[in-house]
Amino acid sequence: MSQLLSSPPMAVFSKTFINHKFSDARFLSSHSILTSGGFAGKIIPLKPTARLKLTVKSRQSDYFEKQRFGDSSSSQNAEVSSPRFYVGHSIYKGKAALTIEPRAPEFVALESGAFKLTKEGFLLLQFAPAAGVRQYDWSRKQVFSLSVTEIGNLVSLGPRESCEFFHDPFKGKGSDEGKVRKVLKVEPLPDGSGRFFNLSVQNKLLNVDESVYIPITKAEFAVLISAFNFVLPHLIGWSAFANSIKPEDSNRLNNASPKYGGDYEWSR
């Protein structure tokens, strides 16, 4: 269960423009015409004392300044052509398989051109029962979404601690509330060799009552915890905020928001 997306490398071109100004009468006469690249003009003779002047102007610095501080047109093109990546981590055992995939947070564009977080990201857990030796029936998979707070509970578990999460997808949504119950339990194995994940699903709408159990070794659980800690700032959108910080904008942004509580606290 892996997908690989790639995009062809993009080439970036920069041009150097050379502007030659011929102003010496020794080289040009009043009847001469200079033609280059579709440009034609009449040359007016100057005094014999005038010297030949060559002016060279490079646009490379302009290009790199735009790349450094952001060019609106190039950023829009980058948004259109930037590749997307789909990742997940899977654990396969004899009775079931578990795949965990991160889901990105959602932002809304403001009139000012900035973006505001509207929904935090989460981790999607997919449990599939075994259908044979090294075969799993993903058509019967059960899913469970971990919020950032629930992820925090997992990463803070002690060696002998356990946790339990209860979800009702239809809670607060009318008559279907309580008809679907999902319970995820994470408990240490009796011999201390790891933990087990047990997902129980009761769906009265589809007449489903199923439980999927998968043991996780210490090493596998350590990989999960490391990945969870890494992805948390991205799920709450703080990584996007950190990447948008520019030193030259910090004073301007803080001064433009005097109602921000931090300004009042540290300005005392």
Swiss-Prot record:
Conditions for induction: By salicylic acid (SA).
Keywords: Chloroplast, DNA damage, DNA repair, DNA-binding, Nucleus, Plastid, Transcription, Transcription regulation, Transit peptide
Signal peptide: none
GO biological process terms on file: defense response; DNA repair; regulation of DNA-templated transcription; salicylic acid mediated signaling pathway
Chief location: plastid
InterPro entries listed in its UniProt record: ssDNA-bd_transcriptional_reg, Whirly
Residue ranges annotated as motif Nuclear localization signal: 171-185
Compartment(s) of residence: Plastid, Chloroplast; Nucleus
GO CC terms in record: chloroplast; chloroplast nucleoid; chloroplast stroma; DNA repair complex; mitochondrion
GO terms of molecular function: DNA binding; mRNA binding; single-stranded DNA binding
Region span, Required for ssDNA binding: 93-98
Ribonucleoprotein recorded as keyword: no
Domain of life: Eukaryota
Phenotype when the gene is knocked out: No visible phenotype under normal growth conditions.
Transit peptide region: 1-75
Gene3D superfamilies: Transcriptional Coactivator Pc4, Chain A
UniProt xrefs under PANTHER family: SINGLE-STRANDED DNA-BINDING PROTEIN WHY2, MITOCHONDRIAL, SINGLE-STRANDED DNA-BINDING PROTEIN WHY3, CHLOROPLASTIC
Family as reported in the entry's similarity comment: Belongs to the Whirly family.
Job description of the protein: Single-stranded DNA-binding protein that functions in both chloroplasts and nucleus. In chloroplasts, maintains plastid genome stability by preventing break-induced and short homology-dependent illegitimate recombinations. In the nucleus, is recruited to a distal element upstream of the kinesin KP1 to mediate the transcriptional repression of KP1. Can bind double-stranded DNA in vivo.
Subunit annotation: Homotetramer.
Protein name according to UniProt: Single-stranded DNA-binding protein WHY3, chloroplastic
Source organism of this protein record: Arabidopsis thaliana (Mouse-ear cress)
